[in-house]
UniProtKB/Swiss-Prot annotation:
This is 53 kDa membrane antigen A. It is found in: Cell membrane. The keyword tRNA processing does not apply. The gene is tdpA. A lipid is attached at C17 (S-diacylglycerol cysteine). It comes from Treponema denticola.
Length: 490
């Protein structure tokens, strides 16, 4: 009897200890459609919650994580239990047709139900890559956004930007400059034909576009004048302040312009602060002009060195970094001397409120390259010809790489293959990786085929339906193929 009482007492003690040490849990609730999330709907140009995919990522103190994807057809509702006192880092991302909006909350779990307050940013946190290709027809380009094709006819290379809603703006030139706008799903949303923005750019010699991802404002540079493009097509001009003509980028009311120098060697990089007062933009230069050298790459050939002057292609700003793309090629033509190459790279500058710091970091190229057999090879890890920035997310930026490779045959160099790739650059780890794409970008280089050397006509004719008689030369399969080639041409 005593043994039974002792055993029962032991069980009771162990059960009490188990209850004493057991963790208590609280429930977190994420309810974007019926809870405390910022309203998002199509009337603002943003996607409907009910029609969009939602990703939830929860990181705990022990660095373990919970990931949940809620499909567009499912309610945007999530619940899970966590130990009381746990510190959670909660990130949600709402995915539209070609862009995403995110929200973040740091939360300590309390007893009972924990409603998580998430304010989705009004500006897109990531923009899916824009695809585009040069078409078989001269001066025709095919853009692709959210699976929809957009045909553009332009006598000059079209320029484009994406705004904070994921909308696509394309400036192009037929006789005069024009501007089209498309929703993030590719639906046209053009300006009225009499909009001030259209009359402003029509006669310009050059046009560049930029969007501020922080403020959501869109800008156009027509020649050396900057204008803000309002949603209805109205414009806000600068008050007589000119800036260098060239690629532009805007970030948090800071304008960055890479000018084109009249003297080969350095292009001026300038930073301005933008102030909008009433109906006028005011530009104030921040810091000193930074000379960006065009002599980024030196080619070593037989002991001599030649520095090539590259062309600057595009500029992008994220947080406190400025990214600049450049490219240059020398293609094999009868009038062009060797060495032949298709090269490029990216520069990264840092800036602050005082201006740009002149200490660029270099990615995707080598300062010095060596020519062999009249060819300079970039290498798979490097750029062949970066064309422009095509998208970004919170960790990386995407770049269109548009170049070609070469091959030497029979004493002459020919274009061997087109290189159409997308480079992804991680802005934190500074790592680059590339992958192939079906997009042709701005250029599709002609892949020249080298025919086999011709045989004497007498020899070719003797092969065409007759017996070949070649004294001292073996009748190999190679000679047969060569003779067949010549027969077709006779």
């Amino acid at each position: 009897m005593k043994k039974k009482l002792f055993f029962a007492l032991l069980v009771l003690i162990l059960s009490s200890c188990s209850l004493f040490f057991q963790k208590e849990y609280g429930t977190i609730t994420i309810d974007l459609e019926g809870g405390r999330a910022r309203s998002i709907n199509s009337s603002t140009g943003l996607p409907n919650l009910a029609d969009s995919e939602l990703e939830i990522d929860i990181l705990t103190e022990g660095n373990s994580s919970i990931y949940k994807k809620i499909l567009a057809s499912e309610p945007k509702f999530f619940q899970a239990d966590f130990p009381i006192g746990s510190r959670l880092e909660i990130t949600v991302k709402l995915n539209g047709p070609s862009s995403s909006w995110s929200a973040h909350n740091s939360h300590t779990v309390k007893e009972g139900n924990n409603d998580i307050r998430l304010l989705l940013n009004k500006n897109a946190s990531s923009l899916a890559n824009v695809g585009f290709s040069t078409a078989a027809v001269v001066n025709k380009y095919e853009f692709n956004i959210a699976g929809k094709r957009i045909d553009i006819n332009s006598r000059e290379l079209p320029v484009f930007t994406r705004d904070s809603r994921g909308r696509l703006y394309i400036a192009y030139k037929d006789i005069n400059w024009k501007l089209n706008r498309y929703e993030s799903d590719g639906t046209p949303n053009n300006f009225a034909s009499d909009s001030p923005i259209l009359t402003t750019i029509t006669g310009a010699s050059s046009v560049n576009l930029a969007s501020d991802p922080v403020t959501g404002k869109v800008y156009v540079a027509a020649d050396s004048n900057l204008y803000r493009i309002k949603d209805d097509g109205a414009v806000t001009p600068t008050g007589g302040t000119a800036h260098p003509a060239g690629p532009i980028a805007v970030y948090n009311n800071n304008l960055f312009v890479l000018g084109v120098s009249a003297v080969s060697g350095n292009n001026p990089l300038k930073m301005f602060t933008i102030t909008e007062e009433g109906s006028v933009l005011t530009l104030n230069q921040a810091g000193s002009l930074i000379p960006v050298s065009t002599g980024q790459i030196t080619i070593s050939t037989s002991g001599s060195e030649t520095t090539i002057n590259v062309d600057f292609k595009d500029i992008l700003v994220k947080k406190d970094k400025i990214y600049i793309l450049f490219a240059k090629n020398n293609l094999p033509t009868p009038s062009t001397p060797s060495p032949y190459y298709s090269l490029g790279g990216m520069l990264e500058y840092t800036y602050n409120s005082s201006g740009v710091i002149d200490n660029p970091q270099k990615y995707g190229f080598n300062d010095t390259v060596t020519a062999g057999d009249d060819i300079v090879t970039a290498g798979e890890a490097n750029f062949y010809g970066p064309a422009c920035f095509i998208g970004y997310d919170e960790q990386s930026i995407s770049i269109a790489d548009d170049g070609c490779t070469f091959k030497k045959e029979g004493g002459s160099v020919r274009i061997y293959k087109n290189v159409n790739r997308i480079f992804s650059f991680n802005t934190s780890t500074k790592s680059l990786y590339s992958y192939a794409t079906e997009n042709k970008w701005f250029n599709e280089y002609e892949e020249t085929a080298t025919p086999p050397p011709p045989l004497p006509v007498r020899l070719a004719r003797s092969y065409c339906g007759r017996k070949i008689v070649i004294r001292g030369i073996p009748r190999s399969a190679y000679l047969s193929r060569v003779a067949q080639f010549v027969c077709k041409t006779l």
